[in-house]
């Protein structure tokens, strides 16, 4: 019995090792960039990331580098999924999760993201300090803390963080008003999204500029000299042009789709949704002493959610001006890149038309030369026919042997007259044929 138990224990150990190996294979490295800007590498599995961001598995598959997905920006309840060219990220209200990569372009993108987050955090901290200094001389609108019970202390701390229309949270950046009251600091998720859009648009713009620098000289050289090497270069350039145009078009279509759908843009306000959730939790704690009022509010919330889910809230228009301006700016940029590619495509098409015209002209010249040679062949054949007639073995006076010098001279004269007459007749026939061809428009 003991050996069998040992064998069973060995089988269980092998199963655990296989499970551990499968779990290790399922996990991957993620580069996490929090609101503080200090990036760190974490190893997490798919289920851990799903629990952390609230994303379904199909959204995480968009970030798989082994799978080919078109450019996509998905707004979910707790995260934004970004798949733009080589930029793949999961953006939450407090951090950005990036699939770790050794690509130099990825390292440059991470540096830009950290710099943007740190700069925005510094500006936000300065504005928060200035606003606290301005509000220190104003009487606080909240009651003084008279009790130190845990519930009241937590509730008072959350309420006291709402000053001057700004909600402060230790776990995420906030949307704060600037000193002039006009400019607003974008929330963390929009700053991260802006870096993603900027990186993707800049990458496509650089590829387009490189293609333009190679394409225009190659096309001009092809128009001046048609050769196999130049044709191969233009063929490769056209293939790259088609590929880049498709990628740029996908990014443009995705931005246009977001701009057309206000509800999708409203879903991307992660910080605002989290702030409303915190305020709702605080209000529920305040109203916990009045169960009847809590029940009424709960019924109203349920009815409002049902109306929104059923589409009966027709007049609802979310507050999306900030995100709309952000997306419009990069939509204009990517549309300009697409226009450059369209102009390059038109230039390629014009070059192809010009080359086809040149080739048609060469073909017409060859056909004209063929007609001229064919006509000359017909005329020469007519002359050969005359020679064949005179070469027949028929007794005529022209072939009679001369008996004296006078007949000999006359015979030679007839020979040259016949020869020159045949040549002149063939020449006249050729000239007449060419004149008729030009007059009828067949020849130039």
From Swiss-Prot:
Topology relative to the membrane: Multi-pass membrane protein
What are the UniProt keywords, alphabetically?
A: Coiled coil, Ion transport, Magnesium, Membrane, Transmembrane, Transmembrane helix, Transport
Which Gene Ontology BP terms does the record give?
Answer: magnesium ion transport
Short sequence motif named Required for magnesium transport activity, residue ranges: 391-393
Q: Tell me, what is one Gene Ontology molecular-function annotation carried by this entry?
A: magnesium ion transmembrane transporter activity
Where in the cell does this protein reside?
A: Membrane
Q: Has keyword Oxidoreductase? A: no
Positions of transmembrane segments: 370-390, 415-435
Superkingdom is: Eukaryota
Alphabetical GO CC annotations of the entry are:
membrane
Q: Which residues form a coiled coil?
A: 195-258
Region (Disordered) spans which residues? 128-155
- Composition bias (Polar residues) maps to 145-155
User: Pfam families from the entry?
Assistant: MRS2-like
Q: Is this entry keyworded Cytoplasm?
A: no
Q: How does it assemble?
A: Interacts with CYCB2-2.
Described by its record, this protein's role is as follows: Magnesium transporter that may mediate the influx of magnesium.
Q: Which family does it belong to?
A: Belongs to the CorA metal ion transporter (MIT) (TC 1.A.35.5) family.
Name the chain's protein: Magnesium transporter MRS2-F
Recorded name of the encoding gene: MRS2-F
